[in-house]
Amino acid sequence: MALARAAGCILSFDPNLRPPLWDDLEQARDQIHWGLAQCDVAKISDDELLFLTGETDFDAGAAKLIAQFPNLQIVNVTAGAQGSISYYQGLRVFQPGVTLGGVIETTGAGDTFCACVLNFLLEHGLEHLTADDLTQMLRFANAAAYLVTTRRGAIRSMPEPEQVLALL
């Protein structure tokens, strides 16, 4: 992580918490805290936000994370079909999820969301993002994540950019 930071890389973290895989949830919390302390960009699900902060209110939970981990430049909170919220330098941008039906399974949706966010940030950078930029980022990421849920299998279900744009 130190080498990546020194090289100017954007560091991202998605805890992808799976409680049954941990013998001790406090150890999971400690490891997630370590990851959050290392990264610039965090993707946190609604359930993970509750686990980490005790907050059901997304704004309050994100504020706690940003206060606790000042290195975080962007916190993206995802809530499945309900949509996602991006918190960046005092901005709060909500983008509704895509709810066209046809969901088969949700495997890979969060990973797809993350990949789209990271692609956007690699193209646009982390500095001077606007609310419109964040809206564009979330809109594309939500649409791509939705498309993954309409297909079986995480890897082969990843949509091409043109497929996402056609949905939008």
Listing of model-derived features with the role each one plays in the protein:
Residues 2-3, 55-168:
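Conserved phosphate-binding/catalytic region of the ribokinase-like
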